[in-house]
Protein backbone atom coordinates (compact mmCIF):
# COMPACT_ATOMS: atom_id res chain seq x y z
CA UNK A 1 0.00 0.00 0.00
CA UNK A 2 1.43 3.38 -1.00
CA UNK A 3 1.47 6.20 1.53
CA UNK A 4 -0.67 9.26 1.12
CA UNK A 5 1.08 12.62 0.97
CA UNK A 6 1.29 14.82 4.07
CA UNK A 7 -1.84 16.89 4.63
CA UNK A 8 -0.33 20.14 3.37
CA UNK A 9 0.62 18.50 0.05
CA UNK A 10 -2.81 16.92 -0.40
CA UNK A 11 -4.68 20.23 -0.30
CA UNK A 12 -3.84 21.16 -3.88
CA UNK A 13 -4.88 17.74 -5.20
CA UNK A 14 -8.17 17.90 -3.29
CA UNK A 15 -8.77 21.42 -4.59
CA UNK A 16 -8.21 20.23 -8.17
CA UNK A 17 -10.68 17.37 -7.78
CA UNK A 18 -13.23 19.72 -6.22
CA UNK A 19 -12.81 22.14 -9.11
CA UNK A 20 -13.39 19.41 -11.68
CA UNK A 21 -16.42 18.20 -9.73
CA UNK A 22 -17.75 21.77 -9.96
CA UNK A 23 -17.27 21.90 -13.73
CA UNK A 24 -13.73 23.10 -14.42
CA UNK A 25 -12.36 21.68 -17.68
CA UNK A 26 -8.96 21.25 -19.27
CA UNK A 27 -5.97 18.90 -19.42
CA UNK A 28 -4.31 18.07 -16.09
CA UNK A 29 -0.63 18.25 -17.06
CA UNK A 30 0.99 20.56 -14.52
CA UNK A 31 -1.94 20.41 -12.09
CA UNK A 32 -0.92 19.75 -8.46
CA UNK A 33 2.79 19.36 -9.29
CA UNK A 34 4.46 16.49 -7.48
CA UNK A 35 1.26 14.47 -7.14
CA UNK A 36 0.59 11.22 -8.98
CA UNK A 37 -2.02 11.26 -11.75
CA UNK A 38 -3.96 8.34 -13.20
CA UNK A 39 -5.85 7.32 -16.31
CA UNK A 40 -9.27 5.73 -15.82
CA UNK A 41 -11.13 2.88 -17.48
CA UNK A 42 -14.40 1.53 -16.08
CA UNK A 43 -16.30 -1.45 -17.46
CA UNK A 44 -19.18 -3.72 -16.47
CA UNK A 45 -18.21 -6.58 -14.16
CA UNK A 46 -18.40 -9.20 -16.91
CA UNK A 47 -15.60 -7.39 -18.78
CA UNK A 48 -13.47 -6.57 -15.75
CA UNK A 49 -11.32 -9.71 -15.85
CA UNK A 50 -10.48 -9.14 -19.51
CA UNK A 51 -9.38 -5.57 -18.76
CA UNK A 52 -7.37 -6.60 -15.70
CA UNK A 53 -5.66 -9.37 -17.67
CA UNK A 54 -4.96 -6.98 -20.54
CA UNK A 55 -3.32 -4.58 -18.09
CA UNK A 56 -1.33 -7.40 -16.47
CA UNK A 57 -0.01 -8.54 -19.84
CA UNK A 58 0.84 -4.99 -20.96
CA UNK A 59 2.28 -3.37 -17.82
CA UNK A 60 4.35 -0.75 -19.65
CA UNK A 61 1.23 0.82 -21.15
CA UNK A 62 -1.27 -0.16 -18.45
CA UNK A 63 0.41 -0.03 -15.01
CA UNK A 64 -2.43 -0.51 -12.52
CA UNK A 65 -2.38 1.76 -9.46
CA UNK A 66 -5.80 0.91 -8.03
CA UNK A 67 -8.85 -1.23 -8.77
CA UNK A 68 -12.28 -0.25 -7.51
CA UNK A 69 -14.71 -3.13 -7.13
CA UNK A 70 -18.15 -2.93 -8.72
CA UNK A 71 -20.12 -0.11 -7.16
CA UNK A 72 -17.15 1.57 -5.47
CA UNK A 73 -16.41 5.15 -6.54
CA UNK A 74 -13.84 6.25 -3.93
CA UNK A 75 -10.18 5.44 -4.59
CA UNK A 76 -7.83 4.58 -1.74
CA UNK A 77 -5.35 6.87 -3.51
CA UNK A 78 -7.60 9.87 -2.79
CA UNK A 79 -9.84 9.56 0.28
CA UNK A 80 -13.16 11.32 -0.22
CA UNK A 81 -12.88 11.19 -4.00
CA UNK A 82 -15.54 10.15 -6.49
CA UNK A 83 -14.18 8.79 -9.75
CA UNK A 84 -17.49 9.58 -11.49
CA UNK A 85 -17.10 13.34 -11.01
CA UNK A 86 -13.51 14.21 -10.08
CA UNK A 87 -11.92 14.21 -13.54
CA UNK A 88 -12.37 17.13 -15.94
CA UNK A 89 -13.76 15.02 -18.81
CA UNK A 90 -14.90 11.47 -19.56
CA UNK A 91 -15.56 9.47 -22.72
CA UNK A 92 -18.58 7.17 -22.92
CA UNK A 93 -18.14 4.14 -25.19
CA UNK A 94 -20.90 1.97 -26.64
CA UNK A 95 -19.92 -0.98 -28.82
CA UNK A 96 -16.43 0.45 -29.28
CA UNK A 97 -17.59 3.90 -30.36
CA UNK A 98 -17.32 7.13 -28.37
CA UNK A 99 -20.89 8.36 -28.14
CA UNK A 100 -20.36 11.26 -25.78
CA UNK A 101 -17.79 13.32 -23.88
CA UNK A 102 -19.12 14.45 -20.51
CA UNK A 103 -17.81 16.40 -17.48
CA UNK A 104 -19.70 14.11 -15.06
CA UNK A 105 -20.16 10.37 -15.59
CA UNK A 106 -22.57 9.76 -12.70
CA UNK A 107 -25.53 9.19 -14.98
CA UNK A 108 -23.69 6.43 -16.83
CA UNK A 109 -22.36 4.61 -13.78
CA UNK A 110 -24.02 1.30 -12.92
CA UNK A 111 -21.83 -0.89 -10.71
CA UNK A 112 -18.81 -0.53 -12.98
CA UNK A 113 -15.40 -1.93 -12.08
CA UNK A 114 -12.79 0.84 -12.32
CA UNK A 115 -9.07 0.63 -13.03
CA UNK A 116 -6.78 3.57 -12.32
CA UNK A 117 -3.67 3.36 -14.49
CA UNK A 118 -0.49 5.32 -13.91
CA UNK A 119 -0.05 8.45 -16.05
CA UNK A 120 3.18 9.94 -17.38
CA UNK A 121 2.11 13.42 -16.25
CA UNK A 122 3.42 12.16 -12.90
CA UNK A 123 7.06 12.19 -13.98
CA UNK A 124 6.87 15.61 -15.62
CA UNK A 125 7.65 17.31 -12.30
CA UNK A 126 10.98 15.42 -11.96
CA UNK A 127 11.77 16.23 -15.60
CA UNK A 128 11.18 19.93 -15.00
CA UNK A 129 13.22 19.81 -11.79
CA UNK A 130 16.13 18.51 -13.87
CA UNK A 131 15.77 21.37 -16.35
CA UNK A 132 14.22 19.25 -19.10
CA UNK A 133 11.40 21.19 -20.79
CA UNK A 134 7.84 19.90 -21.00
CA UNK A 135 6.62 21.70 -24.09
CA UNK A 136 2.87 21.11 -23.85
CA UNK A 137 2.93 22.60 -20.35
CA UNK A 138 4.88 25.61 -21.60
CA UNK A 139 2.28 26.22 -24.30
CA UNK A 140 -0.80 25.38 -22.25
CA UNK A 141 -1.69 22.50 -24.56
CA UNK A 142 -2.59 18.85 -24.21
CA UNK A 143 0.19 16.30 -24.72
CA UNK A 144 0.23 14.77 -28.23
CA UNK A 145 -0.66 11.06 -28.35
CA UNK A 146 -0.39 8.65 -31.26
CA UNK A 147 -1.62 5.22 -32.24
CA UNK A 148 1.26 2.94 -33.23
CA UNK A 149 1.52 -0.25 -35.26
CA UNK A 150 2.87 -2.19 -32.28
CA UNK A 151 0.31 -4.75 -31.09
CA UNK A 152 -0.24 -5.25 -27.39
CA UNK A 153 -0.53 -8.74 -25.93
CA UNK A 154 -4.19 -9.77 -26.28
CA UNK A 155 -6.22 -10.88 -23.27
CA UNK A 156 -9.61 -12.52 -23.32
CA UNK A 157 -11.82 -10.50 -25.64
CA UNK A 158 -9.46 -7.50 -25.74
CA UNK A 159 -6.88 -6.69 -28.35
CA UNK A 160 -5.36 -3.49 -29.65
CA UNK A 161 -2.22 -1.53 -30.49
CA UNK A 162 0.04 0.53 -28.28
CA UNK A 163 -0.65 4.25 -27.92
CA UNK A 164 2.26 6.56 -27.07
CA UNK A 165 2.67 10.10 -25.81
CA UNK A 166 5.45 12.30 -27.19
CA UNK A 167 7.60 14.99 -25.63
CA UNK A 168 10.36 16.75 -27.57
CA UNK A 169 13.64 16.68 -25.63
CA UNK A 170 16.91 18.50 -26.39
CA UNK A 171 19.26 15.95 -27.94
CA UNK A 172 21.85 16.41 -25.21
CA UNK A 173 19.25 15.70 -22.50
CA UNK A 174 17.68 12.53 -23.91
CA UNK A 175 19.82 10.24 -21.77
CA UNK A 176 18.79 12.22 -18.69
CA UNK A 177 15.11 11.99 -19.64
CA UNK A 178 15.42 8.23 -20.08
CA UNK A 179 17.14 7.84 -16.71
CA UNK A 180 14.67 10.06 -14.84
CA UNK A 181 11.50 8.54 -16.25
CA UNK A 182 12.91 5.04 -15.89
CA UNK A 183 12.71 5.53 -12.13
CA UNK A 184 8.90 5.56 -12.40
CA UNK A 185 7.73 2.26 -13.95
CA UNK A 186 4.30 2.60 -12.29
CA UNK A 187 3.61 5.63 -14.50
CA UNK A 188 4.98 4.16 -17.77
CA UNK A 189 8.70 4.37 -16.97
CA UNK A 190 11.39 4.90 -19.60
CA UNK A 191 10.55 5.70 -23.23
CA UNK A 192 9.60 2.95 -25.65
CA UNK A 193 11.24 4.78 -28.57
CA UNK A 194 13.50 7.75 -29.31
CA UNK A 195 13.70 9.39 -32.72
CA UNK A 196 12.02 8.59 -36.03
CA UNK A 197 8.24 8.32 -35.51
CA UNK A 198 7.95 6.15 -38.63
CA UNK A 199 9.54 3.31 -36.66
CA UNK A 200 6.31 3.22 -34.64
CA UNK A 201 4.09 3.49 -37.69
CA UNK A 202 3.36 7.18 -37.01
CA UNK A 203 2.94 8.97 -40.33
CA UNK A 204 3.16 12.56 -39.07
CA UNK A 205 4.05 14.13 -35.75
CA UNK A 206 1.91 17.09 -36.73
CA UNK A 207 -1.27 14.99 -36.70
CA UNK A 208 -1.64 13.27 -33.32
CA UNK A 209 -4.57 10.92 -32.83
CA UNK A 210 -5.30 12.47 -29.43
CA UNK A 211 -4.26 15.73 -27.81
CA UNK A 212 -2.74 18.75 -29.54
CA UNK A 213 -0.08 19.02 -32.28
CA UNK A 214 3.44 19.36 -30.87
CA UNK A 215 6.05 22.05 -31.33
CA UNK A 216 9.47 20.47 -31.92
CA UNK A 217 12.32 22.96 -32.03
CA UNK A 218 15.76 22.76 -33.64
CA UNK A 219 18.07 20.49 -31.70
CA UNK A 220 15.22 18.51 -30.15
CA UNK A 221 14.40 14.83 -30.58
CA UNK A 222 10.92 13.29 -30.33
CA UNK A 223 10.77 10.89 -27.38
CA UNK A 224 7.87 8.46 -27.01
CA UNK A 225 6.44 6.90 -23.87
CA UNK A 226 3.80 4.18 -23.52
CA UNK A 227 0.48 5.86 -22.81
CA UNK A 228 -2.59 5.10 -20.70
CA UNK A 229 -4.84 5.75 -23.70
CA UNK A 230 -3.77 2.26 -24.82
CA UNK A 231 -6.85 0.67 -23.15
CA UNK A 232 -9.04 3.02 -25.19
CA UNK A 233 -7.43 1.69 -28.37
CA UNK A 234 -8.41 -1.78 -27.17
CA UNK A 235 -11.99 -0.60 -26.62
CA UNK A 236 -12.12 0.75 -30.18
CA UNK A 237 -10.76 -2.52 -31.56
CA UNK A 238 -12.65 -4.99 -29.36
CA UNK A 239 -16.01 -3.22 -29.10
CA UNK A 240 -17.29 -4.10 -25.62
CA UNK A 241 -20.92 -3.05 -25.17
CA UNK A 242 -20.14 -0.27 -22.68
CA UNK A 243 -17.23 1.52 -21.00
CA UNK A 244 -16.32 4.87 -19.47
CA UNK A 245 -12.80 6.29 -19.62
CA UNK A 246 -11.03 9.56 -18.95
CA UNK A 247 -10.80 11.87 -21.94
CA UNK A 248 -7.18 11.76 -23.15
CA UNK A 249 -5.07 14.18 -21.13
CA UNK A 250 -7.79 14.68 -18.48
CA UNK A 251 -6.63 12.66 -15.50
CA UNK A 252 -7.53 11.68 -11.96
CA UNK A 253 -5.31 13.63 -9.55
CA UNK A 254 -4.45 11.52 -6.49
CA UNK A 255 -3.23 12.31 -2.99
CA UNK A 256 -0.02 10.31 -3.51
CA UNK A 257 3.35 11.97 -4.09
CA UNK A 258 5.23 11.06 -7.27
CA UNK A 259 8.13 9.98 -5.05
CA UNK A 260 6.06 7.02 -3.82
CA UNK A 261 6.54 5.46 -7.25
CA UNK A 262 10.26 6.29 -7.61
CA UNK A 263 11.90 2.87 -7.41
CA UNK A 264 15.29 4.42 -6.64
CA UNK A 265 14.11 6.52 -3.72
CA UNK A 266 15.91 9.53 -5.24
CA UNK A 267 12.86 11.82 -5.31
Curated annotation (Swiss-Prot):
It comes from the Bacteria. InterPro entries: D-Glu_cyclase (IPR009906), Putative_hydro-lyase (IPR038021), UPF0317 (IPR016938). Its EC number is 4.2.1.-. This is Putative hydro-lyase Krad_0534. Belongs to the D-glutamate cyclase family. It holds the Pfam family D-Glu_cyclase. PANTHER family: D-GLUTAMATE CYCLASE, MITOCHONDRIAL. Keywords: Lyase. GO terms for molecular function: lyase activity.
Amino acid sequence: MVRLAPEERRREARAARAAYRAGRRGPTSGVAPGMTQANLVAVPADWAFDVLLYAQRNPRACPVLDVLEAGRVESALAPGSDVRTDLPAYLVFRDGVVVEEVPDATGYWDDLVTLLIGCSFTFETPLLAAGIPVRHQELGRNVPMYRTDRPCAPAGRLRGDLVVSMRPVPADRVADAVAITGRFPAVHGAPVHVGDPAALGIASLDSPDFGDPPVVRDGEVPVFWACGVTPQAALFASRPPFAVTHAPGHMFVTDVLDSEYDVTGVS
